Regions:
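PAS-family sensory/regulatory modules and their coupling/dimerization elements
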Residues: 64-121, 188
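Short coil/turn motifs at helix boundaries and re-entrant loops, enriched in small/polar
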Residues: 1, 13, 18, 101, ...
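PAS-family sensory domains
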Residues: 19-87, 145-188
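Generic "edge-of-domain/loop-turn" microfeature
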Residues: 28, 103, 113, 125, ...
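Sparse, context-dependent recognition of short Cys/His-centered cofactor- or disulfide-binding micro-motifs
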Residues: 6-8, 15, 79-83, 88-91, ...
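Sensory coupling linkers of modular signal transduction proteins
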Residues: 1-4, 111-137
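Sensory modules in modular signal-transduction proteins
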Residues: 3-30, 132-152
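A generic fold-level signal
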Residues: 16, 111-112, 142, 175
Length: 188
């Protein structure tokens, strides 16, 4: 397998994994990308990427389009982080809500020669779950009586703030993962 076959295999593997993959040269010009990257980029930037496209210019051009929804401050920060990542040779990771209800995880890693590898992963399902779990936790905490949830193995999953606070008054510390037997024995 020669080098170009290896690159194609890598691009295909990332496509099969549902991730976008792009390679940028040391001057931040796009050298290669997979199909998923093209789809994600086109959806967010409102134009298709092409080999030779400059990263900063792409954002400047996209910002002129009224459909472009990414925050200009986030864009400046991302460009600065990419430059710092090139200097530090450390990956940077961020999550962005690219449109209402759609989230991307972006990981960018610099090579030793200054190239930047960008991996885009759609994390909308996970972010939606996290948001719903947070709302549920807030709702449970708002209930004006003790609420404790136990799993099938009688381990504490969640206790609302009132239950935690009032049990502490009796020196009973509620901890996620504690058994129901521990809870009962700590009361007496």
């Amino acid at each position: 397998m020669d080098n170009s076959d290896a690159i194609l295999a890598m691009m295909d593997a990332f496509d099969n994994g549902g991730q976008g993959l792009a390679v940028w040269d040391p001057k931040d010009n796009l050298t290669s990308f997979n199909i998923n990257y093209k789809k994600i980029f086109s959806s967010n930037m409102h134009f298709s990427p092409e080999v030779g496209l400059n990263f900063g210019k792409a954002y400047a051009d996209a910002a002129k389009n009224p459909k472009f929804t990414l925050d200009p401050e986030n864009t400046k920060q991302r460009i600065a982080q990419r430059e710092q990542a090139r200097l530090d040779k450390r990956p940077i990771e961020s999550e962005y809500e690219v449109e209402p209800g759609k989230w991307l995880h972006v990981k960018e890693t610099a090579s030793n020669d200054g190239h930047m590898i960008t991996v885009l992963t759609d994390v909308t399902a996970r972010k939606t779950r996290e948001i719903m779990q947070s709302k549920l936790a807030d709702a449970i905490d708002a209930i004006p009586s003790h609420v404790m949830f136990w799993d099938e193995k009688e381990k504490l999953i969640k206790a609302n703030k009132l239950a935690v606070k009032e049990n502490l008054e009796y020196e009973v510390e509620l901890r996620e993962g504690m058994s129901y037997a521990e809870f009962l024995s700590s009361q007496f």
